Protein backbone atom coordinates (compact mmCIF):
# COMPACT_ATOMS: atom_id res chain seq x y z
CA UNK A 1 0.00 0.00 0.00
CA UNK A 2 1.42 3.36 -1.05
CA UNK A 3 1.44 6.42 1.23
CA UNK A 4 -1.33 8.06 -0.80
CA UNK A 5 -3.51 4.95 -0.55
CA UNK A 6 -2.91 4.70 3.21
CA UNK A 7 -3.56 8.41 3.65
CA UNK A 8 -6.88 8.27 1.80
CA UNK A 9 -8.07 5.01 3.38
CA UNK A 10 -7.11 5.67 7.00
CA UNK A 11 -6.59 9.39 7.51
CA UNK A 12 -9.17 10.99 5.23
CA UNK A 13 -12.06 8.56 4.78
CA UNK A 14 -14.43 7.92 7.68
CA UNK A 15 -13.93 4.66 9.53
CA UNK A 16 -16.51 1.90 9.88
CA UNK A 17 -18.31 2.18 13.25
CA UNK A 18 -18.13 -1.43 14.46
CA UNK A 19 -14.32 -1.89 14.23
CA UNK A 20 -13.80 1.62 15.64
CA UNK A 21 -16.10 1.06 18.63
CA UNK A 22 -14.45 -2.32 19.28
CA UNK A 23 -11.08 -0.54 19.20
CA UNK A 24 -12.45 2.05 21.66
CA UNK A 25 -13.56 -0.79 23.93
CA UNK A 26 -10.12 -2.39 23.84
CA UNK A 27 -8.38 0.96 24.35
CA UNK A 28 -10.63 1.79 27.32
CA UNK A 29 -9.75 -1.59 28.86
CA UNK A 30 -6.02 -0.90 28.71
CA UNK A 31 -6.68 2.63 29.95
CA UNK A 32 -8.35 1.17 33.04
CA UNK A 33 -5.56 -1.33 33.64
CA UNK A 34 -2.80 1.26 33.34
CA UNK A 35 -4.35 4.31 35.02
CA UNK A 36 -6.71 2.59 37.48
CA UNK A 37 -9.71 4.61 36.31
CA UNK A 38 -12.19 4.37 33.47
CA UNK A 39 -12.63 6.42 30.31
CA UNK A 40 -14.91 9.26 31.40
CA UNK A 41 -15.33 12.96 30.64
CA UNK A 42 -18.16 14.65 32.57
CA UNK A 43 -16.47 14.32 35.93
CA UNK A 44 -13.60 16.45 34.64
CA UNK A 45 -16.00 18.92 33.02
CA UNK A 46 -17.66 19.27 36.44
CA UNK A 47 -14.27 20.05 37.98
CA UNK A 48 -13.76 22.72 35.33
CA UNK A 49 -17.05 24.29 36.40
CA UNK A 50 -16.02 24.15 40.05
CA UNK A 51 -12.63 25.71 39.40
CA UNK A 52 -14.19 28.49 37.32
CA UNK A 53 -16.37 29.28 40.33
CA UNK A 54 -13.28 29.31 42.53
CA UNK A 55 -11.85 32.07 40.34
CA UNK A 56 -14.84 34.19 41.37
CA UNK A 57 -14.36 33.48 45.06
CA UNK A 58 -16.81 30.58 45.43
CA UNK A 59 -15.51 27.86 47.78
CA UNK A 60 -16.67 24.99 45.60
CA UNK A 61 -14.08 22.69 47.17
CA UNK A 62 -16.31 22.61 50.27
CA UNK A 63 -19.27 21.13 48.36
CA UNK A 64 -19.97 17.48 49.07
CA UNK A 65 -19.88 16.49 45.41
CA UNK A 66 -16.38 17.83 44.92
CA UNK A 67 -15.23 15.96 48.01
CA UNK A 68 -16.32 12.79 46.19
CA UNK A 69 -14.78 13.50 42.77
CA UNK A 70 -11.91 15.67 44.13
CA UNK A 71 -11.21 19.20 42.98
CA UNK A 72 -7.50 19.28 43.74
CA UNK A 73 -4.95 20.18 41.10
CA UNK A 74 -5.66 21.32 37.55
CA UNK A 75 -6.43 19.63 34.21
CA UNK A 76 -2.66 19.39 33.68
CA UNK A 77 -2.15 17.43 36.91
CA UNK A 78 -5.20 15.15 36.75
CA UNK A 79 -5.44 11.93 34.74
CA UNK A 80 -8.91 12.82 33.43
CA UNK A 81 -7.76 16.32 32.52
CA UNK A 82 -4.78 15.17 30.48
CA UNK A 83 -6.85 12.48 28.80
CA UNK A 84 -9.50 15.02 27.73
CA UNK A 85 -6.85 17.41 26.40
CA UNK A 86 -5.54 14.47 24.39
CA UNK A 87 -9.05 13.76 23.12
CA UNK A 88 -9.50 17.32 21.88
CA UNK A 89 -6.08 17.16 20.20
CA UNK A 90 -6.83 13.81 18.57
CA UNK A 91 -10.22 15.00 17.33
CA UNK A 92 -8.73 18.20 15.91
CA UNK A 93 -5.88 16.38 14.16
CA UNK A 94 -8.27 13.85 12.60
CA UNK A 95 -10.64 16.59 11.42
CA UNK A 96 -7.75 18.52 9.84
CA UNK A 97 -6.47 15.43 8.05
CA UNK A 98 -9.83 15.05 6.34
CA UNK A 99 -10.19 18.81 5.68
CA UNK A 100 -13.32 18.61 7.80
CA UNK A 101 -12.87 21.87 9.72
CA UNK A 102 -15.19 24.72 8.86
CA UNK A 103 -16.91 27.32 11.03
CA UNK A 104 -20.62 26.48 10.87
CA UNK A 105 -23.03 28.73 12.73
CA UNK A 106 -26.43 27.61 14.07
CA UNK A 107 -29.17 28.61 11.64
CA UNK A 108 -31.75 29.45 14.28
CA UNK A 109 -32.02 30.75 17.84
CA UNK A 110 -34.18 27.72 18.54
CA UNK A 111 -31.21 25.49 17.79
CA UNK A 112 -29.04 27.50 20.19
CA UNK A 113 -31.66 27.17 22.94
CA UNK A 114 -31.89 23.44 22.25
CA UNK A 115 -28.13 23.15 22.56
CA UNK A 116 -27.89 25.06 25.85
CA UNK A 117 -30.99 23.66 27.57
CA UNK A 118 -30.38 20.13 26.32
CA UNK A 119 -26.74 20.36 27.37
CA UNK A 120 -27.70 21.54 30.86
CA UNK A 121 -30.24 18.72 31.28
CA UNK A 122 -27.76 16.13 30.00
CA UNK A 123 -24.93 17.43 32.18
CA UNK A 124 -27.16 17.47 35.27
CA UNK A 125 -28.44 13.96 34.57
CA UNK A 126 -25.00 12.55 33.84
CA UNK A 127 -23.50 13.74 37.10
CA UNK A 128 -26.57 12.73 39.09
CA UNK A 129 -25.94 9.20 37.82
CA UNK A 130 -22.16 9.57 38.40
CA UNK A 131 -21.41 9.19 34.71
CA UNK A 132 -22.47 9.94 31.16
CA UNK A 133 -22.60 7.69 28.09
CA UNK A 134 -19.10 6.57 29.05
CA UNK A 135 -18.70 6.05 32.82
CA UNK A 136 -22.33 5.06 33.38
CA UNK A 137 -22.73 3.12 30.15
CA UNK A 138 -19.98 2.21 27.66
CA UNK A 139 -17.22 1.88 30.27
CA UNK A 140 -19.57 1.46 33.26
CA UNK A 141 -21.25 -1.78 32.18
CA UNK A 142 -17.89 -3.56 31.62
CA UNK A 143 -16.99 -2.50 35.18
CA UNK A 144 -19.84 -4.82 36.33
CA UNK A 145 -21.61 -2.00 38.16
CA UNK A 146 -25.38 -2.54 38.38
CA UNK A 147 -25.98 1.21 38.33
CA UNK A 148 -24.76 1.32 34.71
CA UNK A 149 -27.55 -1.04 33.65
CA UNK A 150 -30.12 1.14 35.40
CA UNK A 151 -28.66 4.17 33.64
CA UNK A 152 -28.57 2.49 30.22
CA UNK A 153 -32.22 1.43 30.33
CA UNK A 154 -33.33 4.82 31.63
CA UNK A 155 -31.27 6.60 28.95
CA UNK A 156 -32.96 4.57 26.23
CA UNK A 157 -36.37 5.55 27.62
CA UNK A 158 -35.37 9.19 28.03
CA UNK A 159 -34.05 9.32 24.47
CA UNK A 160 -37.41 8.00 23.19
CA UNK A 161 -39.19 10.89 24.90
CA UNK A 162 -36.52 13.27 23.61
CA UNK A 163 -36.99 12.02 20.05
CA UNK A 164 -40.75 12.51 20.25
CA UNK A 165 -40.33 15.96 21.80
CA UNK A 166 -37.92 17.22 19.13
CA UNK A 167 -40.36 16.19 16.39
CA UNK A 168 -42.85 18.83 17.60
CA UNK A 169 -43.58 21.63 15.08
CA UNK A 170 -41.77 24.26 17.18
CA UNK A 171 -38.44 22.62 16.34
CA UNK A 172 -39.04 22.50 12.58
CA UNK A 173 -36.85 25.21 11.14
CA UNK A 174 -37.99 26.55 7.73
CA UNK A 175 -35.67 25.46 4.94
CA UNK A 176 -34.68 28.17 2.48
CA UNK A 177 -34.93 26.81 -1.06
CA UNK A 178 -32.62 28.21 -3.71
CA UNK A 179 -33.34 27.74 -7.39
CA UNK A 180 -30.43 26.35 -9.43
CA UNK A 181 -30.09 25.33 -13.05
CA UNK A 182 -27.82 22.34 -12.47
CA UNK A 183 -26.36 20.23 -9.69
CA UNK A 184 -23.10 21.56 -8.27
CA UNK A 185 -20.35 18.96 -7.83
CA UNK A 186 -18.79 18.57 -4.40
CA UNK A 187 -15.28 19.97 -4.62
CA UNK A 188 -12.37 20.71 -2.32
CA UNK A 189 -9.56 23.20 -2.70
CA UNK A 190 -6.45 21.01 -3.09
CA UNK A 191 -4.08 23.62 -1.63
CA UNK A 192 -6.30 24.12 1.41
CA UNK A 193 -6.62 20.36 1.93
CA UNK A 194 -2.83 19.93 1.81
CA UNK A 195 -2.23 22.78 4.25
CA UNK A 196 -4.77 21.42 6.70
CA UNK A 197 -3.40 17.90 6.42
CA UNK A 198 0.06 19.19 7.33
CA UNK A 199 -1.39 21.21 10.20
CA UNK A 200 -3.18 18.06 11.38
CA UNK A 201 0.13 16.21 11.38
CA UNK A 202 1.70 19.06 13.35
CA UNK A 203 -1.10 18.87 15.95
CA UNK A 204 -0.88 15.06 16.09
CA UNK A 205 2.89 14.88 16.59
CA UNK A 206 2.76 17.88 18.90
CA UNK A 207 0.31 16.05 21.17
CA UNK A 208 2.44 12.89 21.03
CA UNK A 209 5.54 14.89 21.94
CA UNK A 210 3.76 16.61 24.83
CA UNK A 211 2.50 13.26 26.11
CA UNK A 212 5.90 11.56 25.87
CA UNK A 213 7.69 14.45 27.59
CA UNK A 214 5.12 14.35 30.40
CA UNK A 215 5.46 10.56 30.67
CA UNK A 216 9.18 10.88 31.41
CA UNK A 217 8.40 12.45 34.81
CA UNK A 218 4.76 11.49 35.37
CA UNK A 219 4.08 8.25 33.47
CA UNK A 220 0.36 8.00 34.17
CA UNK A 221 -0.36 11.57 33.09
CA UNK A 222 1.61 11.15 29.87
CA UNK A 223 -0.02 7.82 29.07
CA UNK A 224 -3.45 9.29 29.84
CA UNK A 225 -2.85 11.94 27.17
CA UNK A 226 -1.71 9.28 24.68
CA UNK A 227 -4.88 7.31 25.32
CA UNK A 228 -6.87 10.53 24.92
CA UNK A 229 -5.35 11.14 21.50
CA UNK A 230 -6.34 7.60 20.52
CA UNK A 231 -9.90 8.08 21.78
CA UNK A 232 -10.12 11.39 19.92
CA UNK A 233 -8.99 9.86 16.63
CA UNK A 234 -11.52 7.05 16.98
CA UNK A 235 -14.57 9.15 17.82
CA UNK A 236 -13.88 11.73 15.08
CA UNK A 237 -12.92 9.40 12.24
CA UNK A 238 -15.76 6.96 12.99
CA UNK A 239 -18.17 9.73 14.06
CA UNK A 240 -19.01 7.78 17.23
CA UNK A 241 -22.05 9.42 18.78
CA UNK A 242 -24.23 7.78 21.40
CA UNK A 243 -27.00 10.29 20.74
CA UNK A 244 -27.36 9.07 17.17
CA UNK A 245 -27.29 5.47 18.41
CA UNK A 246 -30.41 6.08 20.53
CA UNK A 247 -32.18 8.75 18.46
CA UNK A 248 -31.77 7.01 15.10
CA UNK A 249 -33.11 3.80 16.55
CA UNK A 250 -36.39 5.50 17.49
CA UNK A 251 -36.80 7.83 14.49
CA UNK A 252 -35.30 6.03 11.48
CA UNK A 253 -34.94 2.46 12.71
CA UNK A 254 -31.20 2.48 12.09
CA UNK A 255 -29.38 0.45 14.73
CA UNK A 256 -25.87 0.10 13.31
CA UNK A 257 -24.22 2.32 15.94
CA UNK A 258 -26.27 0.81 18.78
CA UNK A 259 -25.12 -2.69 17.76
CA UNK A 260 -21.53 -1.48 17.54
CA UNK A 261 -21.72 -0.10 21.09
CA UNK A 262 -23.06 -3.41 22.45
CA UNK A 263 -20.27 -5.34 20.71
CA UNK A 264 -17.68 -2.85 21.97
CA UNK A 265 -18.84 -3.34 25.57
CA UNK A 266 -18.78 -7.13 25.15
CA UNK A 267 -15.16 -6.99 23.99
CA UNK A 268 -14.21 -4.64 26.83
CA UNK A 269 -15.92 -6.65 29.58
CA UNK A 270 -13.63 -9.68 29.37
CA UNK A 271 -10.56 -7.43 29.50
CA UNK A 272 -11.85 -5.55 32.54
CA UNK A 273 -12.68 -8.90 34.14
CA UNK A 274 -9.08 -10.05 33.73
CA UNK A 275 -7.74 -6.87 35.36
CA UNK A 276 -10.19 -7.23 38.26
CA UNK A 277 -9.03 -10.81 38.80
CA UNK A 278 -5.48 -9.50 38.96
CA UNK A 279 -6.47 -7.15 41.79
CA UNK A 280 -7.46 -3.87 40.12
CA UNK A 281 -10.55 -2.47 41.85
CA UNK A 282 -13.52 -1.85 39.50
CA UNK A 283 -15.38 1.45 39.64
CA UNK A 284 -18.75 0.70 41.25
CA UNK A 285 -21.36 3.39 41.88
CA UNK A 286 -24.63 3.62 43.81
CA UNK A 287 -27.45 1.61 42.24
CA UNK A 288 -30.18 3.98 43.40
CA UNK A 289 -32.85 6.26 41.96
CA UNK A 290 -30.05 8.65 40.95
CA UNK A 291 -29.05 6.26 38.15
CA UNK A 292 -32.61 6.00 36.85
CA UNK A 293 -33.51 9.69 37.13
CA UNK A 294 -30.10 10.70 35.80
CA UNK A 295 -30.48 8.34 32.85
CA UNK A 296 -33.93 9.69 31.97
CA UNK A 297 -32.65 13.27 32.08
CA UNK A 298 -29.49 12.42 30.18
CA UNK A 299 -31.33 10.53 27.43
CA UNK A 300 -33.82 13.35 26.97
CA UNK A 301 -31.12 16.03 27.14
CA UNK A 302 -28.72 14.57 24.58
CA UNK A 303 -31.48 14.19 21.98
CA UNK A 304 -32.75 17.72 22.64
CA UNK A 305 -29.21 19.10 22.38
CA UNK A 306 -28.30 16.94 19.41
CA UNK A 307 -25.12 15.53 20.90
CA UNK A 308 -23.75 13.51 23.81
CA UNK A 309 -20.56 14.11 25.76
CA UNK A 310 -18.31 12.51 23.14
CA UNK A 311 -20.36 13.66 20.15
CA UNK A 312 -20.18 17.35 20.99
CA UNK A 313 -16.42 17.20 21.54
CA UNK A 314 -15.45 16.12 18.03
CA UNK A 315 -18.14 18.20 16.35
CA UNK A 316 -17.00 21.28 18.27
CA UNK A 317 -13.43 21.05 16.96
CA UNK A 318 -14.82 20.51 13.45
CA UNK A 319 -16.17 24.05 13.73
CA UNK A 320 -19.83 23.31 14.42
CA UNK A 321 -20.64 26.20 16.76
CA UNK A 322 -23.91 24.58 17.85
CA UNK A 323 -21.85 22.06 19.84
CA UNK A 324 -19.85 24.77 21.58
CA UNK A 325 -23.16 25.69 23.20
CA UNK A 326 -23.86 22.02 24.01
CA UNK A 327 -20.50 21.76 25.77
CA UNK A 328 -21.16 24.96 27.72
CA UNK A 329 -24.55 23.59 28.75
CA UNK A 330 -22.91 20.36 29.94
CA UNK A 331 -20.50 22.23 32.21
CA UNK A 332 -23.32 24.42 33.58
CA UNK A 333 -25.64 21.46 34.18
CA UNK A 334 -23.01 19.35 35.91
CA UNK A 335 -21.98 22.29 38.12
CA UNK A 336 -25.62 22.92 39.12
CA UNK A 337 -25.86 19.26 40.13
CA UNK A 338 -22.71 19.59 42.23
CA UNK A 339 -24.22 22.62 44.02
CA UNK A 340 -27.46 20.82 44.95
CA UNK A 341 -25.93 17.38 45.54
CA UNK A 342 -25.92 17.58 49.34
CA UNK A 343 -29.68 18.26 49.39
CA UNK A 344 -30.79 15.02 47.77
CA UNK A 345 -27.74 12.72 47.74
CA UNK A 346 -28.82 10.57 50.73
CA UNK A 347 -32.31 9.88 49.37
CA UNK A 348 -31.27 9.28 45.77
CA UNK A 349 -27.73 7.94 45.93
CA UNK A 350 -25.50 7.60 48.96
CA UNK A 351 -27.97 5.65 51.13
CA UNK A 352 -28.20 3.01 48.39
CA UNK A 353 -25.77 0.15 47.89
CA UNK A 354 -22.96 0.03 45.36
CA UNK A 355 -23.69 -3.30 43.70
CA UNK A 356 -20.83 -5.16 42.03
CA UNK A 357 -22.17 -8.00 39.87
CA UNK A 358 -18.92 -9.92 40.35
CA UNK A 359 -19.51 -9.96 44.11
CA UNK A 360 -23.27 -10.51 43.94
CA UNK A 361 -23.07 -13.50 41.59
CA UNK A 362 -19.43 -14.48 42.02
CA UNK A 363 -16.69 -13.82 39.44
CA UNK A 364 -17.87 -16.24 36.76
CA UNK A 365 -21.53 -15.67 37.58
CA UNK A 366 -21.17 -11.89 37.28
CA UNK A 367 -19.35 -12.26 33.97
CA UNK A 368 -22.05 -14.60 32.67
CA UNK A 369 -24.88 -12.30 33.81
CA UNK A 370 -23.20 -9.35 32.07
CA UNK A 371 -22.89 -11.23 28.79
CA UNK A 372 -26.45 -12.52 29.01
CA UNK A 373 -27.71 -8.97 29.53
CA UNK A 374 -25.60 -7.69 26.63
CA UNK A 375 -26.94 -10.47 24.41
CA UNK A 376 -30.51 -9.67 25.48
CA UNK A 377 -29.90 -5.99 24.67
CA UNK A 378 -28.56 -6.91 21.23
CA UNK A 379 -31.59 -9.12 20.53
CA UNK A 380 -33.97 -6.35 21.61
CA UNK A 381 -32.24 -3.90 19.27
CA UNK A 382 -32.41 -6.33 16.35
CA UNK A 383 -36.06 -7.06 17.16
CA UNK A 384 -36.89 -3.35 17.26
CA UNK A 385 -35.17 -2.80 13.91
CA UNK A 386 -37.17 -5.57 12.24
CA UNK A 387 -40.42 -4.33 13.79
CA UNK A 388 -39.72 -0.75 12.73
CA UNK A 389 -39.11 -1.58 9.08
CA UNK A 390 -41.93 -4.12 8.98
CA UNK A 391 -44.33 -1.37 10.09
CA UNK A 392 -42.76 1.16 7.72
CA UNK A 393 -42.95 -1.08 4.63
CA UNK A 394 -46.73 -0.73 3.96
CA UNK A 395 -46.52 3.07 4.34
CA UNK A 396 -43.60 3.22 1.90
CA UNK A 397 -45.43 1.04 -0.61
CA UNK A 398 -48.52 3.25 -0.29
CA UNK A 399 -46.48 6.41 -0.93
CA UNK A 400 -44.87 4.86 -4.02
CA UNK A 401 -48.27 3.81 -5.37
From Swiss-Prot:
It is a multi-pass membrane protein. It is found in: Cell inner membrane. Residues 1-13, 100-115, 171-198, 243-259, 305-320, 385-401 are cytoplasmic. Keywords: Cell inner membrane, Cell membrane, Membrane, Transmembrane, Transmembrane helix, Transport. The chain crosses the membrane at residues 14-34, 79-99, 116-138, 148-170, 199-219, 222-242, 260-280, 284-304, 321-341, 364-384. GO terms for cellular component: plasma membrane. It comes from the Bacteria. Signal peptide: none annotated. Its main location: membrane. Residues 35-78, 139-147, 220-221, 281-283, 342-363 are periplasmic. The keyword rRNA-binding does not apply. NCBIfam families: selen_YedE_FdhT. Belongs to the TsuA/YedE (TC 9.B.102) family. This is Probable transporter YedE.
Amino acid sequence: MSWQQFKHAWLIKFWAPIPAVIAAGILSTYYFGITGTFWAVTGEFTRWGGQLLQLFGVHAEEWGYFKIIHLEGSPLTRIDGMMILGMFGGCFAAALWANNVKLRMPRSRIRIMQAIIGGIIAGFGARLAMGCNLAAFFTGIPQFSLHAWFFAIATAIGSWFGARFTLLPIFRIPVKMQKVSAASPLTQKPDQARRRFRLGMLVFFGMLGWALLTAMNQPKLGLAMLFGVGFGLLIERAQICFTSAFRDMWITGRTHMAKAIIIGMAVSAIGIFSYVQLGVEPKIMWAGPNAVIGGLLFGFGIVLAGGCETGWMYRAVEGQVHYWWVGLGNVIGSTILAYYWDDFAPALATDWDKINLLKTFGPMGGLLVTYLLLFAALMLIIGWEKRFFRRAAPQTAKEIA
